[in-house]
């Protein structure tokens, strides 16, 4: 129901903003795709038409891929401006070149592909590869999009959570590559610490 409302909102707003959507909004479309796929798998499992997935792929698509892609979609243009303490001008959110959009689309699809890697194998290697792919995409987002290495050390207190959260999310994606046995514990860094700090 929430996904349907979100899709309706996009359809209503698209005619008004179709000439200047930020290229990073590609991630938002992929986030909706991930949530739709996860929801479909969950319904099939509950109906008994699909075997329970040991790798929890349907849960990860709904509660990890969906919010992370949303963060990359919205945060790709919003967080750098907030970190720079700049006024957000809607006119600056102009569409970028097709090559840039294609590159971001490729990154987003690669991000989603990592969940397929985990689906087809439930052993430690598939977990390492899946999280490794996601970690690379997320670290690119931090260094090349958010440019956290250039974030000033002094900024308003209300941005503290927004600055700390991406690092905890990165830790939650990197640690399963080296210690897959404790993947569920590392996911708490993403779900609880990372997402929680972003909302504060």
Protein language model annotation of sequence segments:
Residues 1-200:
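Hydrophobic alpha-helical transmembrane segments of multi-pass integral membrane proteins
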